[in-house]
């Protein structure tokens, strides 16, 4: 009888923990997230002026046009193109510093930047650990400033104001380095172009 009572107690405890961890806790987090942080809880999706989603401010994407600031290189190629990994995968290349494939990729990135008259700095030739980092350093943004200003036909000072506006500071004021969110910056520049054309 004692053995059966212990089994029933174990089943009850298992059901209680299942109820708490599989239903109550996730629902509580869902309610708190949607109530206090609705934008972040739904992926921080940015929409254009027509209401069409253009990306997430948390996940980088490829920008190839001269009039856009370019993101960091991605080992997963942002799930785009022939060599891309499927959507949902993130991570670095895990190539050793002695691997010729890594050196070849870095040289290719550096040459492409030189063709654009951009000084190849670390942010612009090395991929981030996740391969999806939405930020570049302020220095990397300033390196691309002249190219973007020339392609958009505006003064570099105008672009510099936008860079400063979309620079996120250090986390809690002490952790990490300031970074520029590439999607937010590029979209703000597009909006400036639209406003300029309407005036």
Swiss-Prot record:
Family of this protein: Belongs to the KdpC family.
Gene Ontology terms: cellular component: plasma membrane
Known partners and oligomeric status: The system is composed of three essential subunits: KdpA, KdpB and KdpC.
UniProt protein name: Potassium-transporting ATPase KdpC subunit 2
Localization annotation: Cell inner membrane
Principal location listed in the UniProt entry: membrane
Keyword Nucleotide-binding part of the UniProt annotation: yes
TM stretches of this protein: 13-33
Membrane topology of the entry: Single-pass membrane protein
Top-rank taxon, per record: Bacteria
Coiled coil segments of this chain: none
Role played: Part of the high-affinity ATP-driven potassium transport (or Kdp) system, which catalyzes the hydrolysis of ATP coupled with the electrogenic transport of potassium into the cytoplasm. This subunit acts as a catalytic chaperone that increases the ATP-binding affinity of the ATP-hydrolyzing subunit KdpB by the formation of a transient KdpB/KdpC/ATP ternary complex.
Matches recorded under Pfam families: KdpC
Assigned keywords, A-Z: ATP-binding, Cell inner membrane, Cell membrane, Ion transport, Membrane, Nucleotide-binding, Potassium, Potassium transport, Transmembrane, Transmembrane helix, Transport
Keyword Oxidoreductase on entry: no
InterPro entries from the UniProt entry: KdpC (IPR003820)
């Amino acid at each position: 009888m004692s053995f059966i009572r212990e089994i029933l107690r174990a089943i009850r405890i298992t059901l209680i923990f299942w109820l708490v961890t599989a239903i109550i806790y996730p629902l509580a987090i869902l309610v708190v997230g949607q109530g206090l942080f609705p934008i972040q809880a739904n992926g921080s999706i940015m929409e254009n002026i027509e209401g069409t989603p253009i990306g997430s401010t948390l996940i980088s994407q490829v920008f190839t046009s001269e009039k856009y600031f370019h993101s960091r290189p991605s080992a997963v190629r942002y799930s785009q193109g022939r060599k891309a990994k499927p959507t949902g995968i993130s991570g670095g290349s895990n190539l050793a510093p002695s691997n010729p494939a890594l050196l070849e990729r870095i040289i290719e990135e550096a040459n492409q930047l030189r063709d654009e008259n951009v000084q190849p700095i670390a942010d612009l030739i090395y991929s981030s650990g996740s391969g999806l980092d939405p930020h570049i350093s302020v220095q990397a943004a300033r390196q691309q400033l002249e190219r973007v200003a020339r392609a958009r036909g505006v003064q570099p000072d105008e672009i510099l104001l936008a860079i400063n506006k979309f620079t996120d500071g250090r986390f809690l004021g002490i952790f990490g380095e300031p970074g520029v969110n590439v999607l937010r910056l590029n979209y703000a520049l597009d909006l400036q172009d639209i406003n300029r054309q309407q005036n």
